[in-house]
Amino acid sequence: MTVRLAEPSVPSRRFHGTPTLFDLSLSENPFPPLPSVVAAVRDTLAAANRYPEFLPERLPRLIAERLGVLPDEVVVGAGATGVAMQILRALGGGEIVSSTPTFDGYPIMAEMAGMPLVSVPLDAAGQQDLAALRRAVHRRTALVVLCRPHNPTGTVLDAAAVRGFLAAIPRRVPVLLDEAYAEFLDPADRLDVDGLLRRHANLLVLRTFSKAYGLAGLRIGYCVGRGELIARVRGQQLPFGTPAAAAAAVRACYAADDELRARVGHIRREREALRMSLRACGIDAPVSQANFLYLPGPGVATALRRAGIKAKPYPDGSARITVGDPTAGLAVHTALAGLRG
């Protein structure tokens, strides 16, 4: 499978007026928030006339207790993208080295921060090319970005390869490990984040409550790091920028582990069932450990749009689709069943 450079997509006039039956473009969780989470958020609204904390303390403390790190090693913000933007501003210039295609927020944020983006193509298997990324690092490099699982392919770098890569990067160069979809990983593929942070003071780990926890609309993200680097990121936090609802929602999510694990398990099963059904139709989707599938082109994005399915399209006709809704999965299968003859 070859994955090519992603460009900003422009809606085709051919599909003007085609109704969108399923929006599978943003890797959203198909489940609404749990009732206990909704209730916890609703309870905070009675005090909506009051300002939240000047700088967040309750939310970082909750997350730190969960991860087994110190509260001052956690920085929170408006989703993973909000925290990533804080990181770029904290670095104050230089180049960003990242794979391509990747989460399309990184090119946008790099431009906003005035930081040139050095893009390294994925290898033929849809994996991030660690050797090529290492070669791209030089004296002007301010940040290296890894995604695990990768967006848009869902592929996962081997843990030993990640450890070797971190050891090979100069200590002066921060590495951002984007784990937005970490909760969907097989247990055996999960990293020892605390151990990595102890060994690598230049590491930042980025996560979100938008995906597995289904709180995309509340914009709750965080990163974990050590020492002077995480302190610089914390210095970019917006005063009064974290509403009380965020800590209430996270506390309720953590209290509902079993229910949330069941939802993640459902999404994982639906993902694999859809992947196998599409493979039987000639669509060679790579094994994914996220809540989406990458469907190689040509013609996939067009066939989906024609069927009223909004996906994340790529220039070669490939597409990324959210998984988890069985009805949407059936619509995807129907739209693509005859594409490969």
Put a short name on every predicted segment.
Residues 1-50, 65:
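N-terminal "arm"/small-domain region of PLP-dependent enzymes with the aminotransferase-like
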Residues 34, 202-279, 283-286:
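PLP-dependent aminotransferase class I/II
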Residues 56-95, 113:
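Phosphate-binding glycine-rich loop
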Residues 89-146:
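PLP-dependent aminotransferase-like
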Residues 111, 128-139, 152-175, 179-215:
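Active-site pre-lysine segment of PLP-dependent enzymes
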Residues 114, 118-121, 143-150, 175-179, ...:
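Short beta-strands and strand-loop turn motifs
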Residues 160, 307, 312, 316-341:
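PLP-dependent enzyme catalytic core of the Aspartate aminotransferase-like
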Residues 267-268, 272-307, 323-325:
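Conserved PLP-binding catalytic core of the aspartate aminotransferase-like
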